[in-house]
């Protein structure tokens, strides 16, 4: 008898479509690892799958999957209209392409829709240009994590964000242009702030200002590339992991001395990266006196400090200054690693 006339065995009959027989909750969990476009495409598999995507609680849209901005905008409008305000766990907009960006009048409306759907994790990643994010609809008692990349915001946005989102715990702003000099939150536990300064230009501030971080619940802090901003840490004794990447401008003259070490009394892991913008003929930093004069007067409690990593240009005197301060204040010497590199590394 030919194979085409043979009946399926009992095992084949049972396993023919095990995935479709799974409960909706499991199918939705599987689909949460797909992009929104891939998840919608499952509706053609069978009648079982036709409407499952409407209940997705994770929407991850990547612009690179669309051939034009017009098609992308139409897709986003349709999917949000069809699903209504089904609660969202996460919502992501990711722009990977040069010719299709997130800068469209309707993008802020999609973000507003996500917030009104009680989204808990919100991600907006632009890679070409800067996306102007509207602050007016950031009022949510559900938003816990906000990740932004290449986004332009104002000081008012930061203020409204912390006051309007009372349970926000994680904020990441990478390559963002932020016209703000104060981050104040009683709930924030993790803060990453990497400023937008391509090729040393497009500085956020015209004059030197203090960047005040007042976050009593903060556990993890990462600051990087802050032009004309002097980090001033207030109420950060709960931080246990800290990482700073600062150049010479970060230690320029200011009304408030840089206290990135003395304020972190309970830190256990500390990473310091010193950049180098001005290179002399010998390849050494031109400015170290300001840091040295401040470092010699620092006194702080670092009884919990266990590991320190310092990455700096080869021959940079600032590294030894920091080491001297730490050793002078540590109850037990922590593990200290100094990673020196040449300017072109």
What are these model-derived regions, one by one?
Residues 243-249, 257-266, 271-272:
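Segments adjacent to and within acyl-thioester-processing domains across lipid
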Residues 2-187, 194-196, 326, ...:
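Leucine-rich repeat
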Residues 45, 173, 224-226, 235, ...:
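Short coil/turn segments at secondary-structure boundaries
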Residues 108-113, 134-141, 159-166, 180-189, ...:
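A structural signal for leucine-rich repeat
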Residues 96, 127, 146-151, 171-176, ...:
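Solvent-exposed loop/turn tips at the surfaces of repeat/solenoid architectures
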Residues 1-13, 253-254, 269, 283-290, ...:
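C-terminal capping region of solenoid repeat domains
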């Amino acid at each position: 008898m030919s194979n085409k006339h043979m009946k399926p065995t009992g095992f084949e009959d049972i396993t023919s479509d095990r995935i479709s027989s799974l409960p909706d909750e499991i199918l939705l969990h599987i689909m949460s690892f797909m992009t929104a476009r891939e998840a919608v495409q499952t509706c053609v598999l069978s009648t079982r799958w036709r409407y499952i995507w409407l209940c997705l609680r994770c929407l991850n849209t990547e612009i690179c999957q669309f051939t034009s901005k017009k098609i992308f905008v139409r897709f986003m409008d349709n999917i949000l209209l069809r699903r209504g305000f089904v609660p969202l766990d996460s919502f992501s907009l990711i722009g990977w392409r040069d010719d299709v960006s997130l800068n469209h009048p309707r993008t802020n409306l999609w973000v507003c829709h996500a917030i009104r759907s009680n989204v808990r994790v919100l991600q907006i990643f632009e890679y070409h240009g800067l996306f102007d994010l509207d602050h007016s609809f950031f009022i949510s008692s559900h938003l816990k994590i906000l990740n932004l990349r290449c986004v332009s915001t104002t000081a008012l946005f930061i203020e409204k964000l912390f006051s309007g989102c009372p349970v926000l715990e994680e904020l990441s702003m990478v390559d963002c242009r932020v016209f703000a000099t104060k981050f104040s939150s009683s709930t924030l536990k993790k803060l990453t702030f990497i400023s937008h300064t391509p090729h040393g230009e497009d500085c956020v501030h015209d004059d030197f200002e203090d960047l005040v971080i007042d976050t009593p619940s903060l556990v993890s802090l990462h600051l990087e590339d802050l032009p004309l901003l002097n980090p001033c840490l207030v109420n950060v004794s709960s931080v246990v992991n800290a990482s700073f990447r600062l150049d010479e401008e970060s230690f320029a003259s200011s009304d408030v001395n840089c206290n990135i070490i003395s304020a972190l009394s309970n830190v256990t892991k500390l990473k310091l990266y010193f950049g180098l913008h001005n290179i002399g003929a010998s390849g050494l930093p031109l400015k170290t006196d300001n840091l040295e004069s401040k470092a010699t007067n620092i006194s702080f409690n670092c009884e919990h400090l266990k590991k320190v990593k310092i990455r700096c240009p080869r021959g940079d005197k600032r590294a030894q200054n920091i080491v001297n301060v730490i050793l002078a204040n540590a109850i037990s010497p922590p593990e200290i690693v100094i990673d020196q590199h040449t300017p072109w590394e």
